[in-house]
Amino acid sequence: MSSELFDPKPLVEIKEAYRKNKKFIRHHSDRYKRVKPSWRRPHGIDSKVRKRCKGEREMPSIKYKKPKEIRHLLPNGLRKVRIFNINDLTPLTSLNRFYCGEIAHAVGARKRIAIVNRAKELGICLLNGNARLIPEIEE
């Protein structure tokens, strides 16, 4: 992976692009209380929304996709990489300006502590670095 490919855009541009995104609400959710606003694709044979008639609600489509440079970016401007063991941290040492790690759910407590300590040594940002860590009991 070359760093010029993943040059992070300024956060202002990212937030500006995400501000433009359209909220799609379900057809007739404003008309009936029983119809919740979360998007469902219309399937009716005479549905004006499904037929894409003029003046009706827009349906989600490929034209609303985000630009490639900012797709999958987190609010801090980094991309997320899942980490399963300590060896997954080594590629992130040179790319820690562009990527941050997220420890996978299946990783146990012993490995999780080792990953967190190694990430601190290497200066890698972890999204869930303090999640599910068992504090050591002093005797």
From Swiss-Prot:
Keywords: Ribonucleoprotein, Ribosomal protein. The keyword Iron does not apply. Signal peptide: none annotated. It holds the Pfam family Ribosomal_L32e. GO terms for cellular component: cytosolic large ribosomal subunit. One of its GO terms (biological process) is translation. One of its GO terms (molecular function) is structural constituent of ribosome. InterPro entries: Ribosomal_eL32 (IPR001515), Ribosomal_eL32_CS (IPR018263), Ribosomal_eL32_sf (IPR036351). PANTHER family: 60S RIBOSOMAL PROTEIN L32 AND DNA-DIRECTED RNA POLYMERASE II, SUBUNIT N, RIBOSOMAL PROTEIN L32. Belongs to the eukaryotic ribosomal protein eL32 family. This is Large ribosomal subunit protein eL32. It comes from Encephalitozoon cuniculi (strain GB-M1).
